[in-house]
Regions:
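Catalytic alpha/beta active-site cores
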Residues: 1-237
Length: 237
């Protein structure tokens, strides 16, 4: 290991790195330098693999396997019918059930999916948008059934509906009511699930849909600004 003084480390551009930067230190409001005092030096990133198999049972088996291998969190991939609000037995779901992720139509499916997984110990990420409020509700019910306080749940729900209009197309409702659902999640979690990340704003899908790097950044930040404004309006009411 190097004996170099960490306070004298420089970047490849010969810029000296500090432990902390300016008056807005990491872990302090407004958190522009990070949400933890020492960031990854004390708290490593959550290690998780995006996964969702053709059934809740098979997906559950995979999650237990991943946890045995040492992942520190789970990342749930849902199939297209689940993403767009269709039950697996709906005629429009024919041919798509379980293709790109796990099908979840009912609370019973969710019970099977997360069977014997300690929800108060394992961070869970759910990549879901237009039906985010439904899947989050399922998770809340499971926690309540297992007598787990909601403020003990840790994880993230993508809840990034605007990029669905721009890139993926898995929206259900017009933008205005969809944004209300987004901010309803903000409101509920801020009051009941303090350790839950209520949105994950994504640019990757926009780039994959044909945007340039500049357009990807522009759309992503404009979405973030729109969510921020919607949240301010919500909490000002």
């Amino acid at each position: 290991m190097s004996n170099e003084n960490p306070n004298k480390i420089k970047t490849t551009s010969n810029i000296k790195l500090k432990s902390y930067y300016g008056k807005n230190n990491p872990g302090e409001y407004p958190f522009t330098s990070g949400i933890y005092p020492r960031m990854y030096q004390d708290k490593l990133w959550t290690m998780r693999q995006y996964a969702g198999f053709s059934s809740a049972k098979k997906s559950n088996e995979r999650y237990h396997y991943l946890l045995r291998q040492g992942v520190s969190g789970l990342s749930i991939a849902f199939d297209l019918p689940t993403q767009t609000g269709y039950d697996s037995d709906h005629e429009i779901s024919d041919g798509e059930v379980g293709k790109v992720g796990v099908p979840i139509s009912t609370i019973e499916d969710m019970r099977t999916l997360l069977d014997n997984i300690p929800l108060d110990q394992v961070s869970i990420s759910m990549t879901i948008n237009s039906t985010a409020i439904v899947l989050l509700s399922f998770l809340i019910v499971l926690a309540q059934e297992n007598k787990i306080p909601l403020d003990k749940l840790k994880g993230t729900i993508q809840n990034d509906i605007l990029k669905e209009y721009i890139a993926r197309g898995t929206y259900i409702y017009p933008p205005k009511p969809s944004m209300k659902l987004v901010t309803d999640i903000f409101e509920y979690c801020s009051q009941n699930m303090k350790n839950w990340n209520t949105i994950s704003i994504s640019g990757y899908h926009i780039r994959e849909a044909g945007a340039t790097a500049v357009e990807e950044l522009a759309f992503t930040f404009s979405n973030a600004i729109a969510y921020t404004k919607a949240a301010i309006e919500k909490f000002a009411q």
